[in-house]
């Protein structure tokens, strides 16, 4: 896990103390506290007690900054453990670690939704998942497709969870249900359960999707 220096004041740093790592850590701290909208070159410079122009010595533009912020957050995800346990157990454990990281850094989900995340940590996550699926018995193409299927579920589920919490949890669940359930909805319609399901443990919902994807993967391996 990468230690992240927290920069919460605008006290001016000593001359020469500003480097790329410090800038990115400050930007991640701002994203965690204020949301992605708070991450601007001016805001980061203010937090570091410098000028916006001083940041451009280390990052070419805001997009490079956001890529670096996302990669720093992703670097907290532990690598998939090579300990001889079944591939499925390790992949489920890894999926939970990804979720924990995203909940620590909700802005990460916003960045991933907006752009392709570049950086060594993000690449390592993908390579680890592909390697584990290949280890499980999938060929190269199927390993990549399996990774993409898992990635798409993870991003979608976490985007939903982050928006759910921002919407107020139970209140958000009621609003979602009200959008689908009306007075003329049949009493025995399963859609009437929507609010209850939306408001249940989000980790359970997240792992429901992971589990069913892996069920399909295992069925494919048995063919």
Name every feature range the model reports, one short phrase each.
Residues 170-223:
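A structured, mid-to-C-terminal "fold-capping" secondary-structure block
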Residues 22, 64, 93, 124, ...:
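Amphipathic alpha-helical interaction segments
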Residues 79-121, 140-143, 150:
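Hydrophobic alpha-helical connector segments
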Residues 125-179, 199, 217-221:
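Hydrophobic alpha-helical bundle segments that form small-molecule/ligand-binding pockets
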Residues 1-18, 79, 188-196:
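N-terminal intrinsically disordered/low-complexity leader segments
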Residues 22, 26-64, 68:
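Helix-turn-helix
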Residues 70-76:
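Short, basic, alpha-helical segments at the C-terminal edge of helix-turn-helix-like DNA-binding modules
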């Amino acid at each position: 896990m990468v230690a992240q220096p927290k920069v919460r004041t605008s006290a001016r740093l000593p001359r020469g103390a500003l480097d790329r790592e410090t800038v990115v850590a400050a930007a991640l701290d701002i994203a965690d506290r204020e949301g992605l909208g708070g991450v601007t070159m001016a805001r980061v410079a203010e937090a570091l007690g410098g000028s916006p122009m001083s940041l451009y010595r280390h990052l070419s533009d805001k997009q490079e900054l956001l890529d670096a912020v996302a990669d720093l957050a992703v670097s907290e995800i532990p690598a998939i453990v090579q300990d001889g346990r079944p591939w499925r157990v390790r992949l489920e454990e890894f999926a939970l670690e990804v979720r924990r990281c995203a909940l620590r850094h909700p802005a990460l989900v916003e960045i991933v939704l907006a752009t392709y995340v570049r950086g060594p940590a993000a690449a390592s996550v993908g390579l680890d998942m592909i390697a584990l699926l290949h280890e499980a018995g999938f060929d190269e193409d199927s390993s990549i497709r399996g990774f993409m299927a898992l990635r798409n579920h993870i991003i979608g589920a976490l985007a939903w969870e982050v928006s759910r919490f921002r919407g107020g949890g139970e209140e958000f669940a009621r609003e979602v249900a009200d959008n689908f359930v009306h007075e003329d909805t049949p009493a025995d319609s399963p859609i009437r359960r929507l609010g209850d399901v939306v408001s249940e443990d989000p980790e359970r919902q997240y792992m429901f999707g992971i589990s069913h994807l892996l069920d399909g993967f295992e069925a494919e391996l048995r063919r």
